[in-house]
Amino acid sequence: MLQIWVKLCLLALLFGAGNVSAQQTVTEAKIFLQSSRLAGFRYYEGRKLWPRMQLKDNLNLVREADNTYDTNAVRVEWQGHKLGYVPRAENAALARFMDRGQHPEARITALSKEKRRGRWIEFDVYLSH
């Protein structure tokens, strides 16, 4: 959470403290929240979709507040297909943002296949401001 606060302060200094002239406008700034490895990939639709997924593809994050296993659950989807979840150890702050009406964006940053561990997806999460 401190990392996010520091980034917000830096953005305020850059964009709100006179560094932008009256003629310039800032339309959108993206604030990096976290990088995560998808949890539960092998249990959902990821295996059959793997050949179609590409780096930089958008992912949809869906809050599951009523999830019986994790009250902070955030489901990860690709083109309407469930791939898995944001890992439990990394989802609390993201869930709070979503509960406050924020709509974080996510993009695939790595599609890897390791011999011992199988296929996995890594993704970054941002908030647009």
What label would you give each PLM region?
Residues L2-L11, G16-H129:
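Conserved active-site motif detector
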